Amino acid sequence: MPTITSYFGFLLAVLTITSGLFISLRKLRLI
C-alpha cells in the first residue's frame, strides 16, 4: 500500500511540474 501511495505522489508531482513548464512555455510564446 505505501508503495502505491508513494508512486501516486511521484506521478502527481511529475504531472504538476510538466503542466507548470507547459504553461510557462505558452506564456513565453504569447509574449
UniProtKB/Swiss-Prot annotation:
It is a single-pass membrane protein. Pfam families: PetL (PF05115). It comes from Lotus japonicus. Component of the cytochrome b6-f complex, which mediates electron transfer between photosystem II (PSII) and photosystem I (PSI), cyclic electron flow around PSI, and state transitions. PetL is important for photoautotrophic growth as well as for electron transfer efficiency and stability of the cytochrome b6-f complex. InterPro entries: Cyt_b6/f_cplx_su6. GO terms for molecular function: electron transporter, transferring electrons within cytochrome b6/f complex of photosystem II activity. Its main location: plastid. This is Cytochrome b6-f complex subunit 6. The chain crosses the membrane at residues 3-23. It comes from the Eukaryota. It is found in: Plastid, Chloroplast thylakoid membrane. One of its GO terms (biological process) is photosynthesis. The 4 large subunits of the cytochrome b6-f complex are cytochrome b6, subunit IV (17 kDa polypeptide, PetD), cytochrome f and the Rieske protein, while the 4 small subunits are PetG, PetL, PetM and PetN. The complex functions as a dimer. Belongs to the PetL family.
